[in-house]
Each structure stands twice: as C-alpha cells, then as structure tokens.
Amino acid sequence: MSSAHKKINAWVWVAVVFAVCAVVYGVLSSYPRELAVYSDELRYLDVARSLWQGRGLRVRNMPSDYQKILYPLFILPALALKTTAAQITAIGWLNALYASSAVFPAYALCRATGQNRRRTVFLVGVVALLPTMSAASTFMSETVFLPLSLW
C-alpha cells in the first residue's frame, strides 16, 4: 500500500471520528433549554439575532460595542429556522459540529510533529473525548475556539 493511500485512509478514519463525535454531541445537546438564566447565552443569541436582522451589534435591542462577535457569526445559520426552539436545537447541532471538528487539526498536528500511528490515535481520541466537548451542549464560544486554537 502506498504512502499516499495510507494518508487518505488515515484522513477517512479521522472523518469517521468527526462524524461519530458530531452525532453523539449533537444528540447530547438536543434537550429542552431555558435561556432566561444564562446571561452569556442570551448575549450571544441577541448579538446573532441583531446581525441576522441587519441591525448591527445590539444586546437587548440596545446598540452595543460588544466585541466578541465570532461565536455569534458562527451560530447565524441556525437563525434561518422559524421558531426559537428550532433555532436553539440547530445551535446545539452546530456547536457539536464545530467542537468535533477539533479532531482534524489534532490529527494534522500529530502528523506534522512526526508522531507514530499509536500515539496519533491516542491523541486524536483524547481530543475527541475532552471534557471541554461538553460545551457543545451550551451556547459557549469554546465550541469554536477549541478547533481554532489547534490550527
């Protein structure tokens, strides 16, 4: 088997790990929520909604100089859905996708640093099972910043 073929197979394996993680974390994030309690979640959702509606950066319908807009930009696709419940569920699934995508840069880092296959499997597995992945069940920017920090 050629080296290029082995690399393709390894990337397929990483893609399977990503898909499994995304489904598991997506299912775990699909529970009824009450947003009235968590101020960060409300702020992210308010900023995303104001951006979606073309009203600029607003928090509770008031102009804001809020600077943490990367995560609200990432949850914008969920706002295309009609009901708040559907939007919240979609955000949970988007978070699961974003957090699970950390396995790709983890694998690339292992390959770039010359780790052997056994260590690579271990390290990618650790990233896939990090307790930080539980952030996918909330509206937390960590779901976006974990994969970005690995790149």
Model-based region annotation:
Residues 1-7:
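Short, Lys/Arg-rich, polar N-terminal cytosolic tail immediately upstream
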Residues 9-38, 128-129:
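Transmembrane signal-anchor helices characteristic of membrane glycosylation enzymes that use polyprenol
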Residues 33-50:
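Extracytoplasmic catalytic-loop and juxtamembrane helix elements of membrane-embedded
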Residues 38-39, 64, 137-145:
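Short acidic/glycine- and proline-prone juxtamembrane loop motifs at membrane-interface regions
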Residues 44, 99-103, 141-150:
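Hydrophobic core segments of transmembrane alpha-helices in multi-pass, intramembrane catalytic enzymes
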Residues 46-51, 62-84, 143:
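Short hydrophobic/aromatic helix or loop-helix immediately within or flanking a transmembrane segment
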Residues 90-114, 151:
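Transmembrane-helix motifs of polytopic, lipid-linked glycan transferases
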Residues 106-129, 147:
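Transmembrane-helix signature of polytopic, membrane-embedded enzymes
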